[in-house]
Curated annotation (Swiss-Prot):
Function: Component of the RavA-ViaA chaperone complex, which may act on the membrane to optimize the function of some of the respiratory chains. ViaA stimulates the ATPase activity of RavA.
Organism: Salmonella typhimurium (strain LT2 / SGSC1412 / ATCC 700720)
Self-association and partners: Homodimer. Interacts with RavA.
Name the record gives this protein: Regulatory protein ViaA
Coiled-coil regions, chain positions: none
Highest classification ranks of the organism: Bacteria, Pseudomonadati, Pseudomonadota, Gammaproteobacteria, Enterobacterales
Length: 483
């Protein structure tokens, strides 16, 4: 069966313009306009998705099948083009019968054209085929538009679902444009409203605990690099290519109706020299219905500017991924559990903003892993937030899992973060020795987020930095009073 892409090629129908018009109509829809006004950071993320939309639409048009009736009519038209005028006259009754049987839009016009002329001349033969082709072009264009409209509705539905999800999570997870872009990419998964409301809930809890958010910001950016620009920078010539519309079109892009004499198709010019069709030619010229070539072009010019040469001395400090271990023992339940989950959500926010990875491991008797910054980060975050802290404490297994993870090349500059009340047994000597080796030889940093003031000093001594967030009632009341 004939594909739509083949039909467009045969009839010189350009689908590019229709795809662009559909994309522009989608971007101008009221839903997207309101969304962009409310969440300006996500506008760039959605705009960056446009090439993927275009490719999906082109693929849909390329793979679409032409209806059997239209396929049969196109094949008949192609065969008719090969016939001479006497041969065409012999085949004309069968052609008219075929058009009538297929309910072709051209059937009535073809019948009228033959009945109104007693003699079927070569000029009439040319006109018959020309109008038949025009009818096929209209049918092909209509088919393209119908498919694009179906795709537009589906695409708009998908975009609205992603906009709803991204709009709900943007205040919690999108700190800058980079985070907004990654959040938009994550929203492509199949999620229901009830699922991501858990992230919204912990986002609201995090907003009510600004000290927790501030702690995550300090920990996440404690290794930020510093750059010092040099003074008296010399000027350098900078050349760029600037695209400008060409004054002289240079490429055939299809066929259109118009009155441009210089771009007429040869069959149209042929009718001008036939006495019987001369008035028909002028009528179509006045009504701008003559078939003409559609041309376009572009030009590039070199723009020369000068700018200072900027050299910077950078104090290189790695800002690698987070490996976060969360204690899920019974002593970490209640308010501690809420704080631990909200703190991980805050680290996820920092990771998205700085284009870093955020890997979560839960430790009690077993180790459960989640990656919050991957393509399925939102689903992983929901699963993590759905966990209940009711196990025991095996902090040694947590450290062994961290050490094993840091052996991989992609984690060579990772920071380890352990969230616990640190009320546990002492660490084995081999674990302490291995952690010290990672700190000395590979510059890995180990952070402790202590949720209690009663953590064992023997355990916490191995950490590079201890971030304290006491969840006791007295500390909670003091924090609220200071606000």
């Amino acid at each position: 069966m004939l594909t739509l892409d083949t039909l467009n090629t045969m009839l010189a129908v350009s689908e590019e313009g229709m795809v662009e018009e559909m994309i522009l109509a989608l971007l101008a829809s009221p839903q997207l306009v309101i969304f962009f006004e409310k969440f300006p950071r996500l506008k760039n993320a959605v705009t960056a998705d446009l090439p993927r939309w275009r490719e999906a639409l082109r693929s849909r048009l390329k793979d679409a099948r032409v209806p059997p009736e239209l396929t049969e009519e196109v094949m008949c038209y192609q065969q008719s083009q090969l016939l001479s005028t006497p041969q065409f006259i012999v085949q004309l009754p069968q052609i008219l019968a075929l058009l009538h049987r297929l309910h072709s839009p051209y059937a009535a016009q073809a019948k009228q054209l033959t009945e109104s002329n007693s003699t079927f001349t070569p000029a009439l033969h040319t006109l018959f085929l020309q109008r038949w082709r025009l009818s096929l072009v209209v049918q092909a264009t209509t088919l393209n538009q119908q498919l694009l409209e179906e795709e537009r509705e589906q695409l708009l539905s998908d975009v609205q679902e992603r906009m709803t999800l991204s709009g709900q999570l943007e205040p919690t997870l999108a700190e800058n444009d980079n985070a907004a872009g990654r959040l938009w990419d994550m929203s492509a998964g199949q999620l229901k409203r009830g699922d991501y409301q858990l992230i919204v809930k912990y986002g609201e809890f995090l907003a009510a605990q600004p000290e927790l958010m501030q702690l995550a910001e300090q920990l996440g950016r404690s290794r930020e690099a510093k750059s010092v620009p040099k003074k008296d920078a010399p000027m350098e010539t900078f050349r760029t290519l600037v695209r400008e519309p060409a004054t002289v079109p240079e490429q055939v892009d299809g066929i259109q109706q118009g009155d441009d004499i210089l771009r007429l198709l040869p069959p149209e010019l042929a009718t001008l020299g036939i006495t019987e069709l001369e008035y028909e030619f002028y009528r179509r010229l006045v009504e701008k219905q003559l078939l003409t070539y559609r041309l376009h072009g572009e030009a590039w010019r070199e723009k020369v500017t000068e700018r200072p040469v900027v050299h910077q001395d950078v104090d290189e400090q790695p800002r690698g991924p987070f490996i976060v271990c969360v204690d899920t023992s019974g002593s970490m339940g209640g308010f501690n559990e809420q704080c631990a989950k909200a703190f991980c959500l805050a680290l996820m926010r920092v990771a998205l903003a700085d284009n870093r990875r955020c890997f979560i491991m839960l430790f009690s008797t077993d180790v459960v892993r989640y990656e919050l910054s991957g393509p399925e980060g939102i689903e992983q975050a929901i699963r993590f937030l759905s966990q209940r802290f009711r196990g025991g404490t095996d902090i040694a297994s947590c450290f062994r899992a961290i050490i094993e993870r840091m052996q991989g090349r992609e984690w060579f500059d990772a920071d380890a973060v352990v969230i616990s009340d640190f009320i546990a047994q002492r660490l084995p000597d081999d674990v302490v020795s291995k952690v010290g080796e990672l700190q000395r030889l590979h510059q890995h940093r180990f952070h402790a987020v202590a949720m209690s003031a009663h953590g064992k000093p023997g355990i916490m001594r191995i950490f590079d930095h201890i971030w304290r967030f006491d969840t006791g009632m007295r500390s909670r009341l003091l924090r609220r009073w200071r606000r």
